Amino acid sequence: MTGKKVCIVGSGNWGSAIAKIVGGNAAQLAHFDPRVTMWVFEEDIGGRKLTEIINTQHENVKYLPGHKLPPNVVAVPDVVQAAADADILIFVVPHQFIGKICDQLKGHLKADTIGVSLIKGVDEGPKGLKLISEVIGERLGIPMSVLMGANIANEVADEKFCETTIGSKNQAHGQLLKELMQTPNFRITVVQEVDTVEICGALKNIVAVGAGFCDGLGFGDNTKAAVIRLGLMEMIAFAKLFCSGSVSSATFLESCGVADLITTCYGGRNRKVAEAFARTGKSIEQLEKEMLNGQKLQGPQTARELHSILQHKGMVDKFPLFTAVYKVCYENQPVGEFIHCLQNHPEHV
């Protein structure tokens, strides 16, 4: 029996860190094909193609410099070619690009392909909230799991100990993905509440923007802790309103929940850019260009999508933190008023 073929759809900071793990495991485990393809959006780096650099130097010099990728990870610039014959697709691209990628892949996959989304964000469908894994699953007709956790990519690539959560309705798929991705320093728990796991991954980026505003305005640790707690309460309230499946508080205690929220509010790029926004008054777009080396922020865009859903349901005032982040980012509300928005939070009534 030939091993299962794996394709990583995406090659940014997080995609490259995951490629390091998946490539290492696939080379050692008999029931995976050792050759792992990684779709790379082709870029010119100092006159050379990024795919060529990755395939000769085994390093993503743009998005994960200083880390060697296993030689069995092969960069491919054509997404259809990269995913050809794949049994497992790992999706790890900015959420705003997933629709276009699915359109390209549609009709080109094996009948029994399974997918896992590492993408943190939500989409706005005609009936309100659409999770990214749902978008992929529906467009491609494949069963989807998700992986979310307190996983800052550079630390994962450095092989520093951390945990993560796989949400999978299908237990066999969950175990297969765990085997493919778990290492001694990347520990995985599998749970069945896919929707809750994914909602956590998306919403924590909005809270992190709020935490960054808090840092930029010079508030202390007490204020930031309050922002994190109120953010968590809004995440739970939102999940209970909008998830189709069951939502248990226990899932919020997994790595995908409170752990990911804490690490993102202290160490992630959404926090970093939001702090600079509060300090400098430059636009989010400008700071993205200056600070992120071509990466995209997920927090502000998720806040906008969420705001639209909450408006549609007439529930904006039930989520003051999410709403305040949206208004500061998109409606020119002074960032200095951010804390005022939390002083009359429903949690305190």
UniProtKB/Swiss-Prot annotation:
Phosphotyrosine modifications at: Y326
Assigned protein family: Belongs to the NAD-dependent glycerol-3-phosphate dehydrogenase family.
Modified positions (N6-succinyllysine) in chain numbering: K289
Role according to the record: Has glycerol-3-phosphate dehydrogenase activity.
Designated gene of the protein: GPD1
Originating species: Bos taurus (Bovine)
Protein name: Glycerol-3-phosphate dehydrogenase [NAD(+)], cytoplasmic
Pfam families: NAD_Gly3P_dh_C, NAD_Gly3P_dh_N
EC number: 1.1.1.8
Listed PROSITE patterns: NAD_G3PDH
